[in-house]
Amino acid sequence: MNFAKFQQLVEHRTGFRTMENPTASGEYFSDSCGDLYTFFLKVGPGDVIEDVTYFTTGCGFGTATCSLLVELAKGKTIDQALAITDADIEAALDGYPEKKKDYPERSRFALQAAVEDYRAKRAAGQITDAMLEEARATVAAAAAAADRRGNGTTEEDAKAGPKVLEDAGMLTIKLH
């Protein structure tokens, strides 16, 4: 196991946040330890996962594993994300301790639930390609407007939502 990478994942918690207006979401509850894993997806045209975030009540291994899955799934199509295996997640961390080998499966089940939610909404006509294009255009327009105002907000910032920044003891909340 790569402990340095594990520590980095726990400290940075890539993607650890809820998402406002996700295209889809899904959760998995682990009966073995009581952890809840929830994944949120923003899916764009071509079924590309433009953003993926998560929330978990789990420990450091749960957080690290979900962060790894965010890194592996972001920018992939729905089908490519579904093809991510427990072995792929485990390999990204150079293995897991024997007692923690079920963590990749837990996070993957939550991501699969989000994909199933997305597919169900597509099948029911609740999500169309036109809607995905419109959502992408709205985010791009918000980022462009912020750039014109000169506040340095990028399209990625607009997708991410509010940020709390701390500098020299001053706390700033950036709402975009």
Which residues make up each language-model segment?
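Structured beta-strand/loop patches that form or line metal/cofactor-binding pockets in enzymes
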Residues: 13-46
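Active-site- and interface-proximal helix/loop "cap" or "latch" segments in soluble metabolic
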Residues: 31-32, 44, 48-105
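C-terminal binding/interaction regions
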Residues: 1-19, 25-26, 79, 86-176
